[in-house]
Amino acid sequence: TQLLYHRYKTFNGDMSKGLIIFPCELIFLNGHKLKETIYQYIELWNLGNEFKTWFEEACGVYATLVDRIVPGFPRKDIAAIKEKLQYDDNLVVQAEVFHLWVIEAPQEVAKEFPADKAGLNVLFVPSEAPYHERKVTLLNGPHTVLSPVAYLSGVNIVRDACQHEVIGKYIHKVMFDELMETLNLPKDELEKFANDVLERFNNPFVDHAVTSIMLNSFPKYETRDLPGLKTYLERKGELPKGLVLGLAAIITYYKGGVRADGAEIVPNDAPEIMNLLKELWATGCTKKVTEGVLGAEFIWGEDLNKIPGLAAAVKADLDSIQEKGMLETVKGIL
């Protein structure tokens, strides 16, 4: 807001000096959220109706969606990369070749920002909603639940999870039998997208650590998987076993401790979530753990204990994981 106001004052409200803004925060309709926030600051700081009019008419704020798997710094290969470059670059970022940037804006904006002319996969579309729903549900959703299931089974890389005899079947079940059933898009289109996602998960050149995905798992589940769980229950009259197990796996991961192979389990989330899980697991009672997590409205925005059968199903999975281990529990739902 201050940047825009300074520009407005510098150019004396010249309507040709507005800016085109593409916010990149990973939230739905980020452009709409940014506009709302700017309006709030205009009011809060009493910047005036003339500036507000200039912002509305001279500037454009457009929602965007980015789709690319970016594991980050390639620690395993950095020595070879430095040797090839012949200099030290500590800002190297590993990413898959696939990329998509969807911008909800008219074609006039595309003329101002012709990224597609540079060979980049950038789409200017009337609505980002279908792209957002498809990506969040069939890429981010599986990521969120497969990661704790894989990690607690001793598997550290997404690709290895997909190729695992048991976990691979679990991922396929969640994607094709559960999450796909909740989307209102042509089935052939969804199947193609899901198969493309699996191909990306299996990328032999990208070692995507599941621990990097598990950061802030509860908020991720709330946005990526919970809507699908609710829709599936509404349409099928039963809970999706894979998504329920994914939630139980997240809760188990936040217990901490040590894996069977001796690796230390180190969850990472907001302090209030970490403290809640620590207190609940200290009771030693999976019923209290389940009801406490599902009832945490500061996580979910509601009491998930009210979803028919969910508490009992999550508790049953927690008990099974404690008694039989993760892999045997996964086998039980396939």
Where are the model-predicted features located?
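Substrate/ligand-engaging "lid" and interaction regions
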Residues: 1-334
